Amino acid sequence: MKGKIIKGIAGFYYIYAQDGNVYECKAKGIFRKDNFKPLVGDNAEISVLDQEAKEGSVTAILPRRNSLIRPAVANVDQAFVIFAMEDPKPNFLLLDRFLIMMEQQGIPAVICFNKKDLGEKEELERLYLTPPRCGYQVVLSSTLEGEGIDEIRQILRGKTTVVAGPSGVGKSSITNCMQGEIQMETGEISRKLKRGKHTTRHSQVIPVEKDTFLVDTPGFSSLYLTDMEEDELRNYFPEFLKYEPQCRFQGCRHIHEPDCGVKEALAEGKISQLRYDDYLALYEELKEKRRY
């Protein structure tokens, strides 16, 4: 029988199977022998050992479309990164670090600013929101008032989406809104997963509707860019790409060079000043890291 790994704790893998049940499984020894580690999000073949106890064995991992390093998850279609408009105030540099990590791994990202009822939309628009200026689709939501929920549901439908963001921004509220009726049907998932002590520190997959899955990840308060040279950084700011052909120098870093298409676009308000300032800060951070 086929299914998806929705959680892995202490050598046990919890599989959401085709029959709608969740099976607690051990992986066969061949995976250890081959030094292969199943990941949350993997599609798997299982053999059922005890139907009543819902226990089984993972016999095969089906080919992965992709896999992320942070968070460690397989077969992801997109990332949905949530920050609050207020309480806590958005940390834009932290947001940009996350977006760069997704760009590095080739995963499209959508930005959600939650708690719309608390924030000043005009201020956020000035800083960040206009999509051509930040290079990403942006959604405003309020779980309190039900705003933006239908739009989010459309964005997530039919995909496996990593949901990420700092603690306290309303990630779990949005996830609960998305689950709707399926919360009743997958109550067994909740019961099974409560067996582990470490549930909040691990990523888990939540089935939302047919072919729609959310990968709930632990909240983050800091992220560090690794395995990157400072001259690569510009490749991970998608809004720069449109203006780079206007740069006089090939390999322009968009910092001190004359006749820079990106800096001209910035001066004309076509690129977010906030994003550009974060680019400069991260460029210096990577340069310092290389020095040591």
Predicted feature descriptions by range:
Residues 11, 29, 35-52, 62-78, ...:
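Helix-rich effector regions associated with P-loop NTPase G domains
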Residues 86-134:
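Phosphate-binding glycine-rich loops and their immediate beta-loop-alpha structural context
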Residues 21-30:
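Short, structured beta-strand/loop micro-motifs enriched in basic residues and often containing a Trp
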Residues 13-17, 25, 46:
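SH3/SH3-like beta-barrel fold
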Residues 1-9:
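Structural detector for short beta-strands of small beta-barrel domains
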Residues 117-169:
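Canonical P-loop GTPase G-domain recognition
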Residues 51-61, 89-91:
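Short, Lys/Arg- and Gly-enriched loop/turn segments at beta-strand edges
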